[in-house]
Regions:
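Short, conserved structural patches
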Residues: 2-3, 62, 66-187
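Alpha-helical assembly-interface signal, strongest on the long, hydrophobic N-terminal helix that forms
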Residues: 1-88
Length: 187
C-alpha cells in the first residue's frame, strides 16, 4: 500500500471512529441550544416587564381621573398631589419617559366636546377650548367628564428580543362625583 493510500485509510478509520463516538453528544447539544434558551429567557423578561409597565400605565390614568373626579374645585396644590400620585403608581419603574395629563371635557348642547381645563406632568397640557372626539356614547349634551391620559415610552433594557422604543398609552373618562363639573382654580 502506498503512503498516500495508507493516509487515506487512516483518515477514513478515524472518521468512522468519530461517527461512532457518543460521549460528547450532550455537551454539543447543550452548546447549540444554550443561546436559544438565553434568548427565550431574556425575551420573556423584557416582554414581562413591558406588560407590567402597561398595566401600571393604565392604573396611573385611572388614578388621576378618579382623584380629580372626587373634587368640586381643584387648586394648584391639589393638582400637584393628583399628578404626583401617578408617579407613585408607576413605581418601581423609571418615570422619566412617563407623562400624565388630566383634563375636563365639557359637552355642549349640540354634542360637541371641548377641553375646559387641563394639566400635565412631564408632558403638554391640552389647550382650553380644543375640540375632542369622545368614544361612542359619551357625548351626552351638558355632561362633563374627567379625562386621564398617560403615556410611557418603554425601552427594553437588554434589547435582545424587543429593540427600539415602544410607546404605551392609556386613557380613561370618568364623571365628576360631587358636582356636575370640577372647577380648576389657579392659586
Amino acid at each position: 500500500m502506498s503512503p498516500a493510500a495508507a493516509r487515506r485509510a487512516g483518515i477514513v478509520t478515524r472518521l468512522r471512529a468519530f461517527g461512532r463516538e457518543r460521549r460528547g453528544i450532550a455537551a454539543i447539544e447543550f452548546a447549540v441550544l444554550l443561546p436559544l434558551f438565553l434568548i427565550l429567557y431574556l425575551g420573556t423578561f423584557e416582554v414581562g416587564q413591558g406588560i407590567a409597565i402597561k398595566l401600571n400605565n393604565g392604573l396611573a390614568a385611572r388614578t388621576v381621573a378618579d382623584l380629580a373626579s372626587q373634587y368640586t374645585n381643584i387648586y394648584n396644590a391639589d393638582m400637584t398631589n393628583i399628578l404626583g400620585a401617578s408617579t407613585t403608581v408607576m413605581a418601581p419603574y423609571p418615570t422619566q419617559p412617563f407623562s400624565v395629563t388630566v383634563s375636563e371635557v365639557t359637552v355642549d348642547d349640540k354634542g360637541n366636546a371641548t377641553i375646559t381645563w387641563s394639566d400635565s406632568l412631564n408632558g403638554t397640557a391640552r389647550s382650553v377650548g380644543q375640540s375632542v372626539t369622545l368614544p361612542a356614547g359619551m357625548n351626552t349634551p351638558g355632561a362633563s367628564l374627567i379625562w386621564g391620559e398617560t403615556q410611557y415610552v418603554y425601552t427594553p433594557g437588554l434589547g435582545y428580543v424587543l429593540t427600539g422604543s415602544i410607546t404605551l398609552s392609556s386613557q380613561i373618562f370618568m364623571s365628576p362625583r360631587n358636582a356636575p363639573s370640577v372647577l380648576r382654580t389657579n392659586s
